Amino acid sequence: MTEKPVPHPTEESLPYWEAASAGKLRLQRCASCHAVRHYPQPVCPKCYSIEVEWIDASGRGAVHSWTVAHHAFHPAFKADLPYTLVIVDLEEGPRAMGRLDPAAAPRIGLPVRLSFGADRLPIFTPAE
């Protein structure tokens, strides 16, 4: 059996992955214009500032879009098929992507809450 690939944090993403290991969501916020962003990056896409701070996020949001994966893009994920991927509008503003709890029925606007699996990858569950 092939092991699932794990994230390899960069300098910019390390605080995100450390929080994920603890089951928490942390997002970058520009210290100049206060725009919240995800995924972590070294420069604010709004004002181009390099000043960044990290905030604890609620992990709550609503499904913006979804799709069902029927093809594994890595052999280690083949046993997981099919699975639902969602793009979520987070309460703090940015969008995040992850899997939807397999027991949940996907729909646009579904209120969800984020958790992290043992592999530190995001899993959204209905918050209704």
Regions found by a protein language model. Give the residues of each.
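Short functional micro-motifs and their immediate structural scaffolds
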Residues: 38, 51-53
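Well-ordered alpha/beta subsegment
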Residues: 93-128
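Short coil-to-beta-strand transition motifs
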Residues: 53-62, 106
